[in-house]
Amino acid sequence: MQHTLRRSLPMLAFALAVAIGWHFGFISTESVSMVGMLGITMNTAGARVIDPILSTVAQGYQNAEFIGMNLFPYVPVGQRGGKIITFGKEDFALYNTARAPGADTKRIQYGFSGSPYALESHSLEGLVPFEFLQEAAAVPGIDMARGGIMKVQNIIALRLEYAQATLATTAANYPAGNKTTLVGTAQWSDFSGTSDPISDIEVAKEAIRAKIGKRPNTVAVGAAVWAKLRQHPKIVDRIKYTGRDSATPELVASLFGVKRMLIGDAIYDNNGTFADVWGKYCVIGYTELGTLAELGVPSFGYTYRLNGYPLVEQPYEDRNAKSWIYPVTDEVSPVIAGNTAGYLISAAVA
């Protein structure tokens, strides 16, 4: 009886999802349209029945060690490819706005150019053996399905974090005046008195302000950089008057004159050896979620993600593996929208 019930419940849930989708027009003979719920349109060949509850788990997942979304804010898009909207320098131009009686009013046009973007599809399936489900059912508060989804989403999110870090720490992505490489005693790991992280950050802030008219609001560093930065004599000397024994991200952010000081603690397996995702870099940037209603703001980067993603497809039973399978799919792509809104310090520490 229990075996039959265990097998029947997911099928009943599947049938119910299909019935609800058909009733509300989400599922039809020709296509599966989830626009009303998730903003997704799929043809028959690529049709998926979505588990809305588990998709909510995947979409709400956040790893506190990941900082990429702070430099590349999430922007929902309705297509897997399109143009990145960028705006010109019209806001900073000086116009002759004087008008004589009866004369025509001068006009300006906000021009924009678009760089292409294409979302990447990433999928992974979480496997939960029947035995685990049976044992977890006897312990209140354990949700193996949710745990399986979060494990898969953590892997997908780590890949995205790595992609964001790679974009942000590649010197070729920045214009000539928006990057520098520290060497020798100029590196922040040198405490002999030559290195000066506060001065270096000020140079970066001014380089950004001179090009976009706004001061950066975010500084992001790798874990190795933070380990030295928080102990740097010039940092320690500045914070000693605050009554604090050690530098915190909040204190250093205030010292640098930015809203956010981000520490990239994420690591990844690099051929059997763990390595920091954010390396020995420092990224300074202005990052805000611009909208067309605001006529755009010169943000450093965005993370374009298809509406309603990541999503969890209807779980299915693998009799050979004696497990339930939870497929998770993401359609996402981080992009640098305005490289003049960022500044890269390479080799910040030795």
Residue ranges and their predicted role:
Residues M1-V32:
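N-terminal, non-cleaved signal-anchor transmembrane helix
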Residues A17, M34-M37, L160, Q164:
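Polar, enzyme-active/binding microenvironments
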Residues V32-A98, Y117-E120, V183-S192, V236-A350:
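Sequence/fold signature of self-assembling virion shell proteins
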Residues I84, A103-R107:
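Hydrophobic, aromatic-lined core segments that form the binding pocket/scaffold
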Residues F112-A137:
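Short acidic, glycine/tyrosine-flanked loop/strand segments centered on an H-E-D-like triad
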Residues F130-R215, A223-D237, V349-A350:
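Alpha-helical scaffold segments that mediate packing/assembly in large oligomeric complexes
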Residues T218-G222, L262-I263:
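A structural signal for short, well-ordered beta-strand segments and their strand-loop junctions
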